[in-house]
A protein has these predicted regions:
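Short glycine-rich, low-complexity/disordered patches
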Residues: 11-18, 164-173, 233-237, 248, ...
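Short, ordered beta-strand-loop transition motifs
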Residues: 17-21, 83-85, 182-185, 199, ...
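Long, charged low-complexity interaction segments
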Residues: 116, 121-122, 126, 237-270
Length: 350
C-alpha cells in the first residue's frame, strides 16, 4: 500500500469534521497543535505557522486510516503529492458529478479508454462520497511533477477529442496540481483510498470498468503495474501537445480575435446540416457532431486564465483558481456560446 500511495513522509494531513457546522476538510498534523505556547490558530494557518512541527507519517497512522474506527471519519489520511525536488510517485485525476457535464462515470471511462489505447496501466477508485472516482497512474520511479502533469493533460485532451462533453474543468483536477511547490508551501493533497468507514459502504475502493468493486482489494493492488519514465517520454513524444492544455482562444491583447486552430477535423466529423440558433447566446445543435468538433467548438469560447498563470509564475498558491475560463455551456441538445463567437463558428461549419 505504502509503495503505491507514496507522498511526503515528513508531513501528512488528517480529515476534520465539525458537528456544529457540518463542515469538514483536511489539515496537516502538527505536534504543537493546541499547545498555547506555540499554537495560535487565530493568527496563522497551519501551513504558514512559524512554530509548526509536523508529525511524520507512520504505519500506525495508515493502519488507523484503513481500520476506520472514527465515526466522524477523522482518521482519514491525506498525503501531500509533491516531494522535495518537485517530484511525485503517481498521477491522480479526480472526476465527480460537480465538474462533469453528464455523469462522472462517462468521463472516467473515456479517460481510461485513452490510457488503454496508449498502453498506460491505470486504476479506478470510487471516491469516499460515492459520487465520483479517482483514476490513478503509478510510476516506477519518482517523476518530475511537471512531466506527470503533461501526461495527465495529454490524456485529458485526447479524451475530450473522443468525447467533447468531457469538461475543461478536469484540467484543474489533475494531481499533482502544481509543477513546482510554492515557497514554504506543502502543495496539494490527495486522500488515501481504502478508508475503513467508507469502505463499509462500498466506497473508497477499487472498481472495474463496470464500477463493480474487486472482491479482493489487496490482491488487486499487489498486481497493479507501474510505468517507467522512458515509457512516459515515448508517450509524450508521440501524443504530447504543442500547447499544454490543447488549443484555446488566445488572450493576446495584440490579436484578441484569434481562434484556436482546428485539429485534424474532416468533413466526416460533421452532419450534412448543422442547426444554429442565435438568441441570448449562440446555440449549436449537437446532433451529428463528432467529439473532436464539440471539443473544438467549446474551446473557441475558452482561454487561459491570466490570474492563474500570474500567480503560478510567482510561485504563489493557485488554490481554487481555474486554469481555463470557459464561456461555453454544454446543454442536453446544444452547446451554447457567446454570440461574439458567431463568425468563427460559421467559418468552421462552412
Amino acid at each position: 500500500f505504502s509503495s503505491l500511495f507514496k507522498g511526503r513522509e515528513d508531513v501528512f494531513a488528517k480529515r476534520w469534521y465539525s458537528k456544529a457546522s457540518g463542515k469538514s476538510g483536511y489539515q496537516p498534523v502538527c505536534l504543537h497543535e493546541w499547545n498555547r505556547q506555540f499554537c495560535n490558530k487565530k493568527k496563522y494557518k497551519c501551513a504558514q505557522c512559524p512554530n509548526r512541527h509536523f508529525k511524520n507519517l507512520e504505519y500506525e497512522d495508515i493502519y488507523k486510516h484503513l481500520e476506520g474506527k472514527d465515526t466522524d471519519g477523522c482518521d482519514v489520511i491525506g498525503i501531500y503529492v509533491v516531494l522535495d525536488g518537485n517530484q511525485c510517485n503517481f498521477l491522480c485525476v479526480d472526476f465527480d458529478d460537480k465538474q462533469c457535464a453528464h455523469d462522472y462515470k462517462n468521463d472516467v471511462l473515456v479517460f481510461v479508454d485513452v490510457c488503454k489505447s496508449w498502453d498506460i496501466p491505470c486504476s479506478i477508485e470510487r471516491s469516499r462520497s460515492g459520487n465520483g472516482a479517482h483514476v490513478w497512474i503509478f510510476f516506477k520511479e519518482p517523476l518530475a511533477a511537471i512531466k506527470a502533469r503533461k501526461l495527465g493533460n495529454a490524456i485529458l485532451t485526447e479524451a475530450m477529442n473522443r468525447d467533447g462533453r468531457v469538461s475543461l474543468k478536469s484540467y484543474d483536477r489533475v494531481f499533482p496540481s502544481q509543477d513546482y511547490l510554492p515557497e514554504g508551501g506543502l502543495g496539494n493533497l490527495v486522500a488515501l483510498p481504502l478508508q475503513g468507514k467508507a469502505r463499509k459502504n462500498g466506497n473508497s475502493v477499487f472498481v472495474d470498468e463496470t464500477f463493480t468493486p474487486f472482491e479482493e482489494q489487496w490482491a488487486y493492488l499487489l498486481n497493479v503495474e507501474k510505468v517507467s519514465e522512458p515509457f512516459i517520454d515515448e508517450v509524450l513524444a508521440l501524443h504530447g501537445l504543442s500547447s499544454e492544455l490543447g488549443e484555446l482562444s488566445t488572450t493576446s491583447e495584440s490579436k484578441p480575435w484569434e481562434a484556436p486552430v482546428a485539429q485534424k477535423i474532416t468533413n466526416e466529423d460533421f452532419p450534412k446540416e448543422v442547426v444554429c440558433v442565435k438568441s441570448d447566446m449562440l446555440y449549436v445543435s449537437l446532433v451529428g457532431l463528432s467529439g473532436k468538433v464539440l471539443n473544438h467548438i467549446k474551446r473557441i469560447a475558452s482561454f487561459k486564465n491570466p490570474e492563474f498563470y500570474a500567480k503560478q509564475g510567482m510561485r504563489l498558491s493557485t488554490y481554487n483558481i481555474p486554469r481555463i475560463i470557459s464561456c461555453a455551456d454544454i446543454l442536453e441538445e446544444y452547446v451554447a456560446l457567446p454570440r461574439g463567437c458567431e463568425d468563427v463558428v460559421v467559418e468552421l461549419l462552412m
